[in-house]
Amino acid sequence: MANHDPISDMLTRIRNASEKRHETTKIPASRMTRSIAKVLQQEGFISEISEQGEGVRTELVLSLKYSGKHRLPTIRSMQRVSKPGLRIYKNTRGLPKVLGGLGVAIISTSKGVMSDRDARREGVGGEVLCYVY
């Protein structure tokens, strides 16, 4: 069965793996999922990204981060904002600050996928893909 929303699938796989305290999770690779994973790594939510497989069957293997003695997940919540049935676009001034700047909004812009901070710095708006905190 075809996956019609790979971004939601990615967020769900990461959310489920981190709730179960898994070290890694596998996600079907695409340009968009690679870009989102790079932003998550730059923002410190995941520790490592590697690829496994070849061609159409390529998967991203994400190493999740945990903190403290009790291994609390670094990612507390992931919410999909713009969905296939209802796209959400914001200009530079309308970009959201997640939890007053403690979280990250991942934005798809004309200059690529980036965090809300980077989009403000670049002076571009775009499609708000998800919130992570």
UniProtKB/Swiss-Prot annotation:
Pfam families: Ribosomal_S8 (PF00410). Keywords: Ribonucleoprotein, Ribosomal protein, RNA-binding, rRNA-binding. One of the primary rRNA binding proteins, it binds directly to 16S rRNA central domain where it helps coordinate assembly of the platform of the 30S subunit. One of its GO terms (molecular function) is rRNA binding. Part of the 30S ribosomal subunit. Contacts proteins S5 and S12. InterPro entries: Ribosomal_uS8 (IPR000630), Ribosomal_uS8_CS (IPR047863), Ribosomal_uS8_sf (IPR035987). The keyword Membrane does not apply. The keyword Chaperone does not apply. It comes from Parasynechococcus marenigrum (strain WH8102). This is Small ribosomal subunit protein uS8. Belongs to the universal ribosomal protein uS8 family. One of its GO terms (cellular component) is ribonucleoprotein complex. GO terms for biological process: translation.
